Swiss-Prot record:
Gene3D superfamilies: Alkaline Phosphatase, subunit A, Phosphopentomutase. The gene is deoB. It catalyses: 2-deoxy-alpha-D-ribose 1-phosphate = 2-deoxy-D-ribose 5-phosphate; alpha-D-ribose 1-phosphate = D-ribose 5-phosphate. GO terms for biological process: 2-deoxyribose 1-phosphate catabolic process; 5-phosphoribose 1-diphosphate biosynthetic process; metabolic compound salvage; nucleotide metabolic process. This is Phosphopentomutase. Keywords: Cytoplasm, Isomerase, Manganese, Metal-binding. Its cofactor is Mn(2+). Binds 2 manganese ions. Disulfide bonds: none annotated.
Length: 404
């Protein structure tokens, strides 16, 4: 029975990529800087001591990062019995955003330029917002700027609840984000507003509209809920997910995967929020998955809760939790199963600002006859998609080189 399980640690980069200068990210290193902070006792909130990832280390994480940066991260070295194949991959795509990373690892790199709202204030064209408001029957909106999602709730959440006006904001990514209170504005109303916005953004080539529902009564307890929804453009070509689907296979999305691919190629969507629930759901789907199935999970907390919020200790604690549960996954794998652990970009929690970082991503692969050892530097995330196509004996993808 052949299956592929993709565990995507959102934002878990392993060192600045060769083109990092073009993004202002030279020196960034999500994994390395977390390990360094832990070793120096600077990440002892809710956890303590050096970063402990014994199972990821056995799969080759420390070695993959060493090949990426030229040195082992603090606490990692050669004194580990490797069981997996490891490498690190360069991104071909033009951006360091979520859709680009995901689409490329499924065999479709983004070789065009996304549209962006680059002005930090008055970010959105009036012509665009006028159309959105008219169609939605709204009198106005708040925000209209680049912002951190948590900070903008503290600043504008109460005014939003009083006025009923949605909060529009963006970032360095190709994204239009809308924050609304689940009770006072209504979740269905927020989703409908996002659908309208997605349609009106067509001429602007914006990658995603993101619904950011929140609850609470004031700045001290406003919090995003688990009902986030992404409205992505569809990939410009068929991904390996589409190809497996068309060949009669199954593609199970756990978390926000289905949204990122605009549901293209997805046969089943499983909703889960938080590292524990996402891991539980992944295990449950692997237990029930039949032949010719991909189970694909995005562990978004690493990015949204820890990377963007520059929470080093939280990121470290999350990684250690993930690592401690990996044996549960390994125990479910059959001889012909392929397990891949990777990331879609970096988001170094020690870096300036709150945005993603342009980094190599780890490619850790286990099973399907792979021998433990180095896969080297991969020229594209698309090598993952090509390897999956090879695993299932599908028609080759246009991009990428299989490591199987």
């Amino acid at each position: 029975m052949k299956r592929t399980i993709i565990m995507m640690l959102d934002s878990f980069g392993v060192g600045a990529s060769a083109d990092a200068a073009s993004f202002g990210d030279v020196g960034s290193d999500t994994f390395g800087h977390i390990a360094k902070a832990c070793a120096e006792g600077k990440a002892d909130i809710g956890r303590e001591g050096p970063l402990k990832l014994p199972n990821l280390a056995r799969l080759g994480l420390g070695h993959a990062a060493m090949e990426s940066t030229g040195a082992f991260a603090p606490g990692f070295g050669d004194n580990v019995e490797l069981i997996g194949a490891y490498g690190h991959a360069q991104e071909l795509s033009s951006g360091k955003d979520t859709p680009s990373g995901h689409w490329e690892m499924a065999g479709v790199p983004v070789l065009f330029e996304w549209g962006y709202f680059s002005e930090h204030q008055n970010s959105f064209p009036k012509e665009l917002t006028d159309k959105i408001l008219a169609r939605a029957g709204l009198d106005g909106f708040l925000g209209n700027c680049h912002a951190s999602g948590t900070t903008i709730l503290e600043e504008l959440g109460e005014e939003h609840m009083r006025s009923g006006m949605p909060i529009f904001y963006t970032s360095a990514d190709s994204v239009f984000q809308i924050a609304c209170h689940e009770e006072t504005f209504g979740l269905d109303n927020l989703y409908r507003l996002c659908e309208i916005t997605r349609e009106e953004l067509e001429p602007y080539n914006i990658g995603r509209v993101i619904a950011r529902p929140f609850d609470g009564t004031g700045p001290s307890d406003f919090a995003r809920t688990g009902n986030r929804k992404d409205y992505s453009l569809a990939p410009p070509a068929k991904t390996v997910l589409d190809k497996l689907n068309e060949a009669g296979g199954e593609v199970v999305s756990v978390g926000k995967i289905a949204d990122i691919y605009a549901y293209c190629g997805i046969t089943k969507k499983v909703k889960a929020n938080g590292l524990e629930a996402l891991f539980d759901a992944t295990l449950a789907e692997v237990k029930s998955a039949g032949d010719n199935t991909i189970v694909f999970t995005n562990f978004v907390d690493f990015d949204s809760h820890y990377g963007h919020r520059r929470d080093v200790a939280g990121y470290a604690k999350g990684l250690e939790y993930f690592d401690a549960r990996l044996p549960e996954m390994l125990a479910l794998l059959g001889e012909d199963d392929l397990l891949i652990l990777t990331a879609d970009h970096g988001c170094d929690p020690t870096w300036q600002g709150t945005d993603h970082t342009r980094e190599y991503v780890p490619v850790l692969a286990f099973g399907a006859g792979l021998k433990a050892g180095s896969l080297g530097r991969r020229k594209s995330f698309a090598d993952i998609g090509q390897s999956i196509a090879s695993h299932f004996k599908l028609e080759p993808m246009a991009y990428g080189e299989s490591f199987l």
